Amino acid sequence: TIEFEERMYAVGRIPGSFNRREGKPSERGILNSRIIDRPMRPLFDEELRNDTVVTCTVLANDYDNPVEIVASLGASISIASSDVPWNGPVATTNVCHIGGEYIVNPSADQRAAADCFVCIASTFEKVVMIETEANEAPEGVVLEAIRIAHETNMEIVKFINSIVAEIGKPKFTFEKAAVNHELLDDLMN
């Protein structure tokens, strides 16, 4: 489970009147937690029964740099260097296409002006999540943006692996639950 907590003070505001407490996540917080969770979840062993929770708390935000990218990388580094068995790491990169040029991790203004924007999460070997906003962009433009993002992610994954090699803990082992085949056959019939 990924929890994305964006405190109001991170953007220079203090909640007033009705919403004095920051009890529930904002819509943006929910979407950011999904961007982090979607590529990470399939990389866990499906028989792992231990709850794993990553909490990303935004302490400062400047609206120009995508906080979900930094939070995604932080979550990936924390799980990869922990003792939790996981088939990561994963990296996330934004790429946009403006006027024939590709920009990696664009600013908010560049993203708004782009005719194609992709958010790609990938391991070293493969792409595991694609999120795209393409205003009738040609297929070749979108595919090139995906390729650039994946190549960038491969470099980031190498960096994460170097961190894990220095500070990573050995992964714990767990017993996989035995399947009761008689019960399974009864349920299927």
Describe the residue ranges of each PLM region.
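Glycine-rich anion/phosphate-binding loop at the beta-strand->alpha-helix junction
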Residues: 31, 36, 46-97
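Glycine-rich, flexible beta-strand/loop modules in the N-terminal catalytic cores of phosphate-handling
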Residues: 1-52, 58, 65, 124, ...
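Conserved nucleotide-binding/hydrolysis micro-motifs of P-loop NTPases
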Residues: 8-9, 60, 100, 136
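Short intrinsically disordered coil segments
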Residues: 17-20, 70, 108-109
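Mobile "lid/hinge" segments at catalytic clefts and subdomain interfaces of large enzymes
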Residues: 83-189
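Short, surface-exposed loop/turn segments at secondary-structure boundaries that line and modulate
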Residues: 9-21, 60-65, 167-188
